[in-house]
Regions:
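An acidic, low-aromatic, low-complexity terminal/linker signal
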Residues: 1-160
Length: 160
Protein backbone atom coordinates (compact mmCIF):
# COMPACT_ATOMS: atom_id res chain seq x y z
CA UNK A 1 0.00 0.00 0.00
CA UNK A 2 1.40 3.40 -1.03
CA UNK A 3 1.69 5.87 1.85
CA UNK A 4 0.28 9.38 1.28
CA UNK A 5 2.80 12.18 1.61
CA UNK A 6 2.08 14.66 4.36
CA UNK A 7 3.01 18.28 4.83
CA UNK A 8 3.43 20.28 8.04
CA UNK A 9 0.98 23.10 8.75
CA UNK A 10 0.25 25.51 11.56
CA UNK A 11 -3.46 25.66 12.19
CA UNK A 12 -5.18 28.86 13.29
CA UNK A 13 -8.66 30.26 13.75
CA UNK A 14 -10.07 33.62 12.69
CA UNK A 15 -13.67 34.47 13.47
CA UNK A 16 -15.47 31.12 13.21
CA UNK A 17 -13.27 29.52 10.53
CA UNK A 18 -10.21 27.30 10.87
CA UNK A 19 -7.23 27.64 8.54
CA UNK A 20 -3.91 25.88 8.00
CA UNK A 21 -0.75 27.62 6.76
CA UNK A 22 2.25 25.67 5.43
CA UNK A 23 5.03 25.74 8.00
CA UNK A 24 7.61 26.32 5.25
CA UNK A 25 6.09 29.77 4.55
CA UNK A 26 5.69 30.85 8.18
CA UNK A 27 8.05 33.67 9.06
CA UNK A 28 6.76 34.84 12.44
CA UNK A 29 3.70 35.24 14.64
CA UNK A 30 3.14 38.63 16.22
CA UNK A 31 0.76 39.79 18.93
CA UNK A 32 -1.82 42.46 18.17
CA UNK A 33 -0.62 44.97 15.60
CA UNK A 34 -1.90 48.44 14.84
CA UNK A 35 -3.52 48.30 11.41
CA UNK A 36 -4.06 51.31 9.21
CA UNK A 37 -7.22 50.76 7.15
CA UNK A 38 -7.18 51.69 3.46
CA UNK A 39 -10.39 53.50 2.43
CA UNK A 40 -11.99 51.89 -0.61
CA UNK A 41 -9.78 48.78 -0.46
CA UNK A 42 -11.12 45.27 -0.94
CA UNK A 43 -12.82 43.95 2.23
CA UNK A 44 -10.21 41.21 2.54
CA UNK A 45 -7.45 43.79 3.15
CA UNK A 46 -7.64 44.45 6.89
CA UNK A 47 -5.04 47.22 6.59
CA UNK A 48 -1.35 48.01 6.50
CA UNK A 49 1.18 47.79 9.28
CA UNK A 50 4.86 48.56 9.62
CA UNK A 51 7.22 45.88 10.89
CA UNK A 52 10.89 46.79 11.21
CA UNK A 53 10.45 49.72 8.81
CA UNK A 54 8.74 47.64 6.12
CA UNK A 55 5.10 48.23 5.23
CA UNK A 56 3.12 44.99 5.03
CA UNK A 57 -0.45 44.32 3.92
CA UNK A 58 -2.50 42.34 6.43
CA UNK A 59 -5.38 40.24 5.12
CA UNK A 60 -8.53 38.89 6.73
CA UNK A 61 -8.92 35.26 5.61
CA UNK A 62 -12.54 35.12 6.83
CA UNK A 63 -13.52 38.02 4.57
CA UNK A 64 -12.07 36.18 1.58
CA UNK A 65 -13.62 32.86 2.51
CA UNK A 66 -17.08 34.23 3.16
CA UNK A 67 -16.94 37.37 1.00
CA UNK A 68 -18.09 39.15 4.15
CA UNK A 69 -17.21 42.84 4.40
CA UNK A 70 -18.53 42.92 7.97
CA UNK A 71 -15.86 40.49 9.20
CA UNK A 72 -14.00 41.61 12.32
CA UNK A 73 -10.86 43.47 11.19
CA UNK A 74 -8.84 42.95 14.34
CA UNK A 75 -7.32 39.88 15.91
CA UNK A 76 -5.10 38.71 18.73
CA UNK A 77 -2.35 37.62 16.34
CA UNK A 78 -0.93 38.27 12.91
CA UNK A 79 0.81 35.46 11.06
CA UNK A 80 3.53 36.76 8.75
CA UNK A 81 4.10 34.61 5.68
CA UNK A 82 6.96 34.73 3.21
CA UNK A 83 6.77 33.53 -0.38
CA UNK A 84 9.70 33.73 -2.76
CA UNK A 85 9.32 36.53 -5.27
CA UNK A 86 6.57 38.54 -3.55
CA UNK A 87 6.48 40.87 -0.53
CA UNK A 88 5.81 39.37 2.89
CA UNK A 89 2.22 39.67 4.07
CA UNK A 90 0.17 38.98 7.16
CA UNK A 91 -2.97 37.03 7.96
CA UNK A 92 -5.23 37.80 10.94
CA UNK A 93 -5.71 35.06 13.56
CA UNK A 94 -7.70 34.95 16.80
CA UNK A 95 -6.23 31.67 18.00
CA UNK A 96 -2.96 29.94 17.14
CA UNK A 97 -3.11 26.17 17.20
CA UNK A 98 -0.28 23.73 16.87
CA UNK A 99 1.83 22.31 14.08
CA UNK A 100 0.18 19.28 12.50
CA UNK A 101 0.90 17.00 9.57
CA UNK A 102 -1.85 16.76 6.99
CA UNK A 103 -2.25 14.75 3.80
CA UNK A 104 -2.87 16.65 0.54
CA UNK A 105 -5.96 18.86 0.64
CA UNK A 106 -9.13 18.29 -1.35
CA UNK A 107 -10.19 21.06 -3.72
CA UNK A 108 -12.61 23.74 -2.59
CA UNK A 109 -15.83 23.86 -4.55
CA UNK A 110 -16.13 27.63 -4.35
CA UNK A 111 -15.52 30.67 -6.53
CA UNK A 112 -12.41 30.86 -8.70
CA UNK A 113 -10.84 33.46 -6.39
CA UNK A 114 -11.34 31.21 -3.37
CA UNK A 115 -10.07 28.10 -5.09
CA UNK A 116 -6.98 30.03 -6.21
CA UNK A 117 -6.23 31.78 -2.89
CA UNK A 118 -6.77 28.68 -0.80
CA UNK A 119 -5.19 25.32 -1.49
CA UNK A 120 -8.25 23.28 -0.60
CA UNK A 121 -9.59 21.89 2.63
CA UNK A 122 -8.66 19.14 5.05
CA UNK A 123 -11.13 17.48 7.36
CA UNK A 124 -10.02 15.80 10.57
CA UNK A 125 -12.10 14.03 13.22
CA UNK A 126 -12.58 17.31 15.06
CA UNK A 127 -12.77 20.10 12.48
CA UNK A 128 -12.41 21.23 8.90
CA UNK A 129 -9.43 23.41 7.92
CA UNK A 130 -9.19 25.67 4.90
CA UNK A 131 -5.63 25.38 3.63
CA UNK A 132 -3.80 28.56 2.74
CA UNK A 133 -1.67 28.37 -0.41
CA UNK A 134 0.60 31.38 0.23
CA UNK A 135 2.01 31.64 -3.30
CA UNK A 136 -1.45 31.50 -4.89
CA UNK A 137 -2.84 33.72 -2.14
CA UNK A 138 -0.24 36.41 -2.91
CA UNK A 139 -1.18 36.31 -6.60
CA UNK A 140 -4.92 36.35 -5.86
CA UNK A 141 -4.40 39.42 -3.67
CA UNK A 142 -2.37 40.96 -6.52
CA UNK A 143 0.84 41.40 -4.56
CA UNK A 144 3.47 42.55 -7.03
CA UNK A 145 6.75 40.70 -7.52
CA UNK A 146 9.52 42.08 -5.34
CA UNK A 147 11.75 44.66 -6.97
CA UNK A 148 11.70 47.55 -4.53
CA UNK A 149 10.31 46.00 -1.31
CA UNK A 150 8.19 48.88 -0.02
CA UNK A 151 7.07 50.18 -3.40
CA UNK A 152 5.82 46.79 -4.54
CA UNK A 153 3.59 46.40 -1.48
CA UNK A 154 2.19 49.89 -1.77
CA UNK A 155 1.54 49.49 -5.50
CA UNK A 156 -0.29 46.21 -4.91
CA UNK A 157 -2.45 47.72 -2.18
CA UNK A 158 -3.31 50.86 -4.16
CA UNK A 159 -4.35 48.68 -7.10
CA UNK A 160 -6.92 46.88 -4.91
Amino acid sequence: MKQQSTKRFLWFRHNDSFFAAPLENLQEILNQLVLRPIPGADACLAGLTTIRDIVLPIFDPSAILKADASSKKSASYTIILAVEGVPRFGILADEIGKVMEFPPATALSQSARLAFAFGGEIETKHRKFVVLAPDNFARAMELSPVSAPQDSVLNAVSAS
